[in-house]
């Protein structure tokens, strides 16, 4: 917007002079080329929040092919909107716990589903929800490992306390903005966490502490 406003004023100013068209074009081109984000930084950040990315049994069956699973058309009608956002944040409400792939009530989606999510333009995932432990310790850890393999930032579940301490609150930086992202769940359908794994449960004392830590990161929003 700052670039646009500057150029509009410049064009109006030059149109009121008696300079030749060539001279006007030369000045406009020179000044336009000299503008940079360091002088006029981007002041807009587009955020998209989506939930819940799930796979019920019917969806898993529909994606099955002779060689695996194909989700390439899953986001066809929304992919453009997803990619318009600078940060497209989604709640991954399934585990990637491996075979057998199952829907409700204990979800485990094919790995190809995560690939499709990534290819659609989602670039941040939150993983703390009531299905985080549908495949227990192995499902939680495998889900994290697969997300990490795609280098997608994520928040909510952790292999151990050391990982949580290093990665949480999740600091996102884009277009000169800094955002601290927090994620919690009310529960995991009665399935207990197996140490040393961590699921961020709603706990006001812990949340208050996390908020203070996020403030120390000096974000523009949290």
Positions of the model-derived regions?
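Acidic, metal/ion-coordinating pockets
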Residues: 19-222
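Positively charged n-region of N-terminal signal peptides that target proteins for export
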Residues: 1-4
